[in-house]
Regions:
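Hydrophobic anchor at the beta1->P-loop junction of P-loop NTPases
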Residues: 36
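Short glycine-rich substrate-engagement loop in P-loop NTPases that contacts/grips substrate
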Residues: 58-90
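Conserved lysine of the Walker
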Residues: 44-45
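Short regulatory helix/loop adjacent to the ATP-binding pocket of P-loop NTPases
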Residues: 126-141, 157-158
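Interdomain hinge/linker elements that couple catalytic modules in large macromolecular machines
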Residues: 2-7, 151, 158-303, 307
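A cross-kingdom feature that marks ATP-driven nucleic-acid transaction machinery
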Residues: 1-17, 27, 53-54, 66, ...
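Structural recognition of the conserved hydrophobic beta-strand(s) that form the central parallel beta-sheet
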Residues: 117-123, 144
């Protein structure tokens, strides 16, 4: 344990606290068992270390990574017990999905060490169902950490302190932006290519992001789904087929034939890609379980992934719709619209470029046109970048 403590202290010393994502404040850190999930690279590890550094009694806290060599010969439960017996009160376990059988041991810690608070993080939601097998779903409070919003990107890259905006504020054009000396469209276009992840300023950003995407498809999902090598190859092929066709309107019969897959198996593969955070599914509004519905369209999660996969020649309309859905889905229930592109709380949204008109939303009870090359909101026409201030 001493080596783990030394590694923890070193990581803590190297953790910056100049900027902490506002997502931190959405978490109730007083809960006994907290799960923080999200894509690789969105900043889960940094946020956890920042929380410890800023709010915890360091002598009573321990942060470990589940893929540490220490766990090749030690159980997480045994570490938790030894740490608790030494006076430990808060244990943070990062990359929990990399530890085989983690869900069972987390349940043991929760049940047998009731005075020890536990926070775990995972790079995706891939192990959610496995955790449920150990009844974790009734014990843990889980949070999903999204990509950086446009607002967060500006605050980090420009050292600003811009505030979030509600959907109503955005629809009325009330956004906290320093128009006097700065142009939002310029920064928005930068963000589209490399602004969705906290390491956007690193020189090899695109390479790292592509590696993270491929690792999710080649390693994380196959491990979760207990796939054969042949099946994992088909999953990777499916991912690239979908990525090159977004927004993709699923035709299960054609896809299954092209991949030599059972039509009954294909929905599971698409579900894995959605749960991994790489894709977002747009569905019709339903009174039943929406997750069981076949998606109307599939989008990559964000435009940075589009560029990282070398799909930068994608239609501008695809990128617009991708980011509108990516931002709004974290704060609102978003559905496909029967007369236009999207529907949120009964409001219809048509997403387009400078020449987009409101023709398609004329029959909507309440509708807005969302454009990507304007700076100001005028009437029911809203700049798309403003939706990047929702969180």
């Amino acid at each position: 344990m001493e080596a783990l403590l030394q590694s923890f202290r070193m990581r803590l010393d190297l953790t910056p606290t100049a900027y902490v994502r506002s997502f931190h404040d959405t978490i109730n850190w007083n809960n006994r068992l907290i799960g923080i999930l999200g894509q690789k690279g969105v900043g889960k590890s940094t946020m956890i270390l920042q929380h410890i550094k800023m709010y915890d009694d360091i002598s009573e806290s321990l942060y470990v990574q589940a893929d540490d060599f220490y766990f090749a010969s030690h159980r997480i439960y045994d570490l938790a017990l030894a740490f608790f017996q030494r006076g430990g009160k808060k244990l943070y376990i990062d990359e929990i999905h990399k530890y085989s059988g983690w869900n069972t041991e987390i349940k043991m810690i929760y049940d047998q060490l009731p005075l020890l608070k536990l926070v775990y993080s995972g790079s995706s939601v891939l192990d959610l169902k496995k955790g449920a097998k150990a009844d974790l779903s009734r014990r843990t409070i889980e949070y999903f950490m999204p990509i950086l919003s446009f607002r967060e990107y500006l605050n980090i890259s420009k050292a600003w302190n811009l505030k979030t905006a509600s959907l109503d504020e955005i629809l009325s054009g009330h956004i906290d932006f320093p128009y006097g000396e700065h142009r939002p469209i310029k920064y928005y276009k930068e963000y589209l290519q490399r602004g969705c992840y906290p390491y956007f300023s690193e020189e090899d950003f695109i390479i790292k992001l592509k590696q993270a995407v491929i690792a999710t498809v080649e390693d994380d999902i196959p491990k979760y789904a207990e796939m054969t090598v042949a099946a994992s190859v088909k999953l990777k092929k499916l991912m690239f087929m979908l990525a090159q066709s977004v927004p993709y309107k699923p035709n299960y019969t054609t896809l299954a034939r092209d991949l030599d897959l059972s039509r009954n198996t294909l929905p599971d593969y698409i579900d894995y890609l959605e749960k991994s955070g790489l894709f977002n599914a747009l569905r019709e509004k339903s009174t039943g379980d929406g997750l069981l519905q076949k998606p109307e369209k599939l989008y990559l999660d964000n435009s940075n992934i589009i560029y990282a996969l070398g799909l930068d020649k994608s239609d501008a309309g695809t990128i617009r719709e991708t980011m509108f859905l990516s931002w709004t889905r974290h704060m609102c229930a978003v559905y496909s619209s029967k007369i236009s592109d999207f529907e949120i709380d009964g409001i219809t949204f048509e997403v387009g470029g400078r020449n987009k008109t409101g023709r398609q939303i004329k029959s909507a009870e309440r509708g807005f046109v969302v454009k990507d090359d304007i700076e100001y909101a005028v009437g029911n026409t809203i700049p798309i970048w403003m939706f990047g201030f929702l969180y």
